[in-house]
Every structure is written in C-alpha cells, then in structure tokens.
C-alpha cells in the first residue's frame, strides 16, 4: 500500500461531499472531534468534481490574467466554488466545479 499524501483534515479531493453526500467531510470531522458517531456516508447524487486551475485566467491569449466567464463555463447547472485566492497562477488550484449528475 502506497500513500502519496496524508491530510488529517477535510481535503479538496472530497469537497463533493458538501453537495452530494448525506454527511459532508466537514461535518464528519466535527462529529469525530465531538466524540459523536460517524455520519451516513451515502452519496445522494452521482457527482463529478473538476479542479479549476489558474491556467483558466490566462486562456484567451490576452496579456495578463482575466476573470473567466463563469456563466459560460458552468452553464448555470454546475456548483462553482472559488477559494478566494487573490492571484491566479498557471497550475495553482483556484477553486472547483461540482456537477450533480443524477439523484440516487
């Protein structure tokens, strides 16, 4: 068994639990710290999470970064979460998009 990363906290690889699971990874951490039983981990939706990298701010061949057209990128149906970072850089995680595909 090989590990490439250990995170003793909620992690960005599980952010889809906020919208798609009965109990989010954030609530699970609070429950553990409070000595409560673990919550239901059942997925309510089939879900896809896509990372948003700083590359997107530089994608139109303009000089310098520009704010992406979020409405065009999300189509109004994806859940957009930006992390509030001030400076986009190529390869930097700036946020994520969650798509709830269908209810289970």
Identify the residue ranges that each predicted region occupies:
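Generic C-terminus detector
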Residues: 78-104
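Active-site "cap" helix and flanking loop/linker of ATP-utilizing ligase/carboxylase catalytic domains
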Residues: 7-59
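Protein kinase-like catalytic core scaffold
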Residues: 1-5
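Glycine-rich active-site loop/lid that clamps phosphate-bearing ligands
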Residues: 43-46, 52-88
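Short, low-complexity, polar/charged sequence segments that are solvent-exposed and flexible
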Residues: 22-26, 69-72, 76-80, 99-102
């Amino acid at each position: 068994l090989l590990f490439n990363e250990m995170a003793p906290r909620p992690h960005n690889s599980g952010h889809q639990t906020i919208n798609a699971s009965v109990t989010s990874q954030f609530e699970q951490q609070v429950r553990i710290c409070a000595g409560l039983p673990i919550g239901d981990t059942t997925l309510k939706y089939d879900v896809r999470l896509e990372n948003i990298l700083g590359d997107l701010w530089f994608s139109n061949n303009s000089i310098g970064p520009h704010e992406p057209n979020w409405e065009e990128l999300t189509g109004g149906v994806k859940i957009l979460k930006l992390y509030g970072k001030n400076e986009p850089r190529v390869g930097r995680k700036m946020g994520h998009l969650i798509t709830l595909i269908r209810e289970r």
